[in-house]
Amino acid sequence: MHLAVYRNANSNLFAALGADCGVDCVGDEISGTALIHMLDAINKNSGMPQTVIYTLNPSNAAQIASIAGAFPNVRCGAAWWFCDHKRGIREEMEITAENSSLGSFLGMLTDSRSFLSYARHDYFRRIAADILGDWVNGGEYDKESAVSLAEKISYYNIKELTEQ
């Protein structure tokens, strides 16, 4: 689920070039209550499928992380679009750790429009290693747990999800 996105903001450019030409924007904050009711209805009626929630509006991140933590099979997605820079990735990971479960985080992603996205994944892993290293150096986390967490969010969590 991509939340808080405003698609095709420039109508002249959309008319000339069509969708996915670079005029999407950060959208308004979403209603946490509406998201909770929707996820609860899905969970009650049919069981919660594997669900990943991405927000393009960083002001929603803590709320969405806490909501994701309240439901089985719901995870926070990586910082995306306007948030996939050093500060955005760091903030998304820290907010997820504080309000949900970083241990189930799926790490960086890409889409079919990306070409040679190794650099994006390498960049993410370097930032993740920096965060985990800060926690270890600050005495907040032990080294073995940090290595295990790095492996999970860089490889094992998505492997497990895609093999289900």
Predicted segments with their positions:
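C-terminal helical cap
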Residues: L56-S59, C76-I95, D142-T162
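Short acidic (Asp/Glu) and glycine-rich catalytic loops that position anionic groups and cofactors
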Residues: L13-A19, P72-R75, F105-T110, L132-N137
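Mid-to-C-terminal alpha-helical segments outside catalytic/metal-binding sites
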Residues: G103, R120-Q164
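Divalent metal-binding pocket/active-site signature
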Residues: M1-S59
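Histidine/acidic-residue-rich catalytic or RNA/ligand-binding cores of hydrolases
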Residues: A9-G18, A61-A70, K86-M93, F115-D130
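Alpha-helix capping and helix-loop boundary segments enriched in small/acidic/polar residues
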Residues: C25-E29, A119, S145
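Short acidic/histidine-rich active-site segments
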Residues: M1-A4, V52-Y54, C76-A79, L102-R120
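Glycine-enriched alpha-helix->loop->beta-strand junction motifs that scaffold or abut catalytic
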Residues: K44-M48, A70-C76
